[in-house]
Amino acid sequence: ADSEALLRGLLEAGRDVLYLGFSSGLSGTYEAISLLCNQLAAEFPERKIFSVDTLAASGGEGLLVWHAVQKAREGLSIEELRDWVEQHRLNLAHWFTVDDLMFLWRGGRVSKTSAWAGTLLNIKPVLHVDDEGHLIPMEKVRGRKKSLNALVDHMEKSAIPPVADQTVFITHGDCLGDAEYVADKVRERFGVRDVVINYVDPVIGAHSGPGTMALFYMAESRN
């Protein structure tokens, strides 16, 4: 109801709409809003209404929106913006780690046995969002510092050059010190000047727990 009221208000005010949705691989929200957009398009035929499944989450979706805003300021039309997002969404790399495996167990991401064993052995998973928009475990490292460094290592392997010119987003689950550590590593290793740090959003944070750390940047590919 809130989404419909927002979209309807924009359309009634004579605005066109480009909806960039949270990954359909992690939520049913995109499908619901896309259906709503189609219904409203029939009701407001004089307006342009587009929806794009970003296949992204958290700061990854935010960074994709940030890039879209820059393109809009450069003068791209709404159709060109839609096409740009569709063409570049799989260049948006998401690399995550978590500090408490029990949150992943409660969310069904790992088994209870794996969560307990990993906790005892101080194992930290490194995860990413794949081309279908799913959150996938990629590797395991021992110790928090190694998991933070692993995020930056992945950026070194895949970031689109010139890396120093990129805008990088970092989100964290109430662990600002770790976020600043990763930001410093990104600045030191790649010369990046524009690093934006923010809290992980509540929905993601509820599933991943305190200590969640995520790094987002533009990459040759997500893998």
Task: State where each predicted segment sits.
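A glycine-rich beta-strand to alpha-helix segment
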Residues: G21, F50-S51
